[in-house]
C-alpha cells in the first residue's frame, strides 16, 4: 500500500501506551487460520519514553502492508535499540492437543515471557488475553489502533512467513512460500493430491475433509 493511500486511512498511534505509563508491550499472534505450520506471537516492549516517533510512519496493521513494507518495518524494529522483542510459538502438535484458541494464548504468553524485561502492562490484540506475568488489557482491533500491537503483528507475521518459506523448500508441492499455509486453492489441491505432512493441522475440519476426499479418490 502506498504511503499516500495509507495516510488517508486510520493509522495506529501510541495514545493507549502513553496513557498507561510505565513499561508497555504490545502483543499479537499470527497463524490461526492456516492448515499447516505453527501459530506465532510477538511481544514488542517499548522504551519508557514511548514509541520512537521516527518509526511510526512505517508501522501499521500487518494485514494492510505488502511483504516489502513488512520487511522494511521488521528490519527497522529489530535495529531500534530502545525496542525489545519476544517471540513465542505453539507447534502443530500443541495446536492439535489444545485447540487453536488455547495454542494462540500459549504462544502469546511465551512471547511475553521471553522479553528480557517483563512489562508493567501488555496490550493484547483481541477480546481475550492469556495468563501473563504482568497486567493485561485487551484491545479489539488493536493492530489497527496501537503502534505497539501493530509492531507485534508485523514481527509475528514476518517470522511466521519466513518459517513457512523455509518449510516450503522441503515440501514444495503446497505453495507455502506464497500462501504461508493458508487454505488457498493451490494448497488445498496439493493436500488432496499428495496428502499431509507432519506440519499439517490434521485436527482441523477442512484438513480432515480434504484428506477424506483424497481417500475417496484412491478407492
UniProtKB/Swiss-Prot annotation:
Its cofactor is Mn(2+); Mg(2+). Pfam families: RNase_HII. It comes from Granulibacter bethesdensis (strain ATCC BAA-1260 / CGDNIH1). It is found in: Cytoplasm. This is Ribonuclease HII. Residues 22-219 form the RNase H type-2 domain. HAMAP family: RNase_HII_B. The keyword Signal does not apply. Manganese or magnesium. Binds 1 divalent metal ion per monomer in the absence of substrate. May bind a second metal ion after substrate binding.
Amino acid at each position: 500500500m502506498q504511503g499516500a493511500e495509507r495516510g488517508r486511512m486510520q493509522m495506529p498511534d501510541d495514545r493507549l501506551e502513553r496513557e498507561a505509563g510505565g513499561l508497555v508491550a504490545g502483543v499479537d499472534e499470527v497463524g490461526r487460520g492456516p492448515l499447516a505450520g505453527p501459530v506465532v506471537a510477538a511481544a514488542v516492549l517499548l522504551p519508557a519514553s514511548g514509541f520512537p516517533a521516527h518509526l511510526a510512519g512505517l508501522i501499521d496493521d500487518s494485514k494492510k502492508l505488502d511483504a516489502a513494507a513488512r520487511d522494511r518495518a521488521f528490519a527497522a524494529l529489530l535495529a531500534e535499540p530502545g525496542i525489545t522483542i519476544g517471540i513465542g510459538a505453539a507447534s502443530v502438535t500443541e495446536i492439535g492437543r489444545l485447540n487453536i484458541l488455547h495454542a494462540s494464548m500459549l504462544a502469546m504468553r511465551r512471547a511475553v515471557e521471553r522479553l528480557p524485561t517483563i512489562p508493567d502492562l501488555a496490550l493484547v490484540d483481541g477480546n481475550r488475553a492469556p495468563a501473563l506475568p504482568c497486567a493485561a488489557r485487551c484491545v479489539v482491533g488493536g493492530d489497527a489502533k496501537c503502534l505497539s500491537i501493530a509492531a507485534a503483528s508485523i514481527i509475528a507475521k514476518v517470522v511466521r512467513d519466513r518459517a513457512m518459506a523455509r518449510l516450503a523448500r522441503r515440501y514444495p508441492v503446497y505453495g507455502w512460500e506464497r500462501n504461508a499455509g493458508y487454505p488457498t486453492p493451490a494448497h488445498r489441491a496439493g493436500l488432496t493430491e499428495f496428502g499431509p505432512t507432519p506440519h499439517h493441522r490434521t485436527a482441523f475440519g477442512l484438513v480432515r475433509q480434504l484428506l477424506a476426499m483424497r481417500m475417496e479418490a484412491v478407492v
